[in-house]
């Protein structure tokens, strides 16, 4: 049975995560406040960010950068800036 939460990213009720996806207090906050739909949007942005900036997840500084971008995107309403990327226009 799925959980319904108020997603702070989407600003509406949505299906919550099945389990905590990220460690620590930030992971608890994501579990309680971020829906599956919002998390999928973040994963798409995260993949683009890792590829475009050639981030190495073995590098602590790169992981810190990615975590800060995640916080900015999910909780502070800031979009991820990827140089040279222009989003498709919605019709």
From Swiss-Prot:
InterPro entries for this protein: Fe_traffick_prot_YggX (IPR007457), Fe_traffick_prot_YggX_sf (IPR036766)
Entries under Pfam families matching the protein: Iron_traffic
Cystine residue pairs: none
Coiled coil feature spans: none
Source domain of life: Bacteria
Subunit details: Monomer.
Protein name in UniProt: Probable Fe(2+)-trafficking protein
Source species of the chain: Citrobacter koseri (strain ATCC BAA-895 / CDC 4225-83 / SGSC4696)
């Amino acid at each position: 049975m799925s959980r319904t939460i108020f997603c702070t990213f989407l600003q509406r009720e949505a299906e919550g995560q099945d389990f905590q996806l990220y460690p620590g207090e930030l992971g608890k906050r994501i579990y309680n406040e971020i829906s599956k739909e919002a998390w999928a949007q973040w994963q798409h942005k995260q993949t683009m960010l890792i590829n475009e900036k050639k981030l190495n997840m073995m590098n602590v500084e790169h992981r810190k950068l990615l975590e800060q971008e995640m916080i900015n995107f999910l909780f502070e309403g800031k979009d991820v800036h990827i140089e040279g990327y222009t989003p498709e226009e919605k019709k």
